[in-house]
Amino acid sequence: MVSLLLALVLSSVPSGQAVEQDYTLAYKKSVEQNKPLMVVVGAPWCPACTVLKNSTIMPMAATGELDEVSVAVINKDDDPELVEQLTKGEKMLPQIIMFTKNDTGGWNRQLLKGFQPKQPVRSLIRSAIAARRG
């Protein structure tokens, strides 16, 4: 009930971006717009994943704090092969993985594991943006 109410409230907020982006779409947007790619890996049966999404990711998207990154939210159960590749086999959920393009055309990877309040996510975003600007 609370998550439904939160979804309704957040859907009426005009600023920010949609959080539920498909990985392929988010990756493409990241490359085209030269933005860091933030991948949130979770599962619907994971309580910490639900709390992360509802109390950190969705409110940050609603206030525009995620506008400088391209965001993908991936359900571990829906795409286990992609999750295995992105997490490098790390099983802990949830995970926030930040990919930033480097000067050689490759991607640098930063990781937050477990539930995270807004401040560590803000720090991760700032770090990724600073790395992008070099």
Regions found by a protein language model. Give the residues of each.
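Electron-transfer interface patches adjacent to heme c in soluble/periplasmic c-type cytochromes
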Residues: 84-91
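N-terminal targeting signals for export/organelle localization
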Residues: 1-16, 134
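Conserved redox-active cysteine motifs that mediate thiol-disulfide chemistry
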Residues: 41-55
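Short pre-active-site segment immediately N-terminal to redox-active cysteine/selenocysteine motifs
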Residues: 34-37, 42-45, 92
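Active-site-proximal beta-strand/loop segments in catalytic clefts of secreted hydrolases
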Residues: 41-44, 74-77, 99, 114-115
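A short beta-strand-turn-helix
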Residues: 18-35
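Thiol-based oxidoreductase modules, predominantly thioredoxin-like and allied folds used
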Residues: 17-21, 57, 61-81
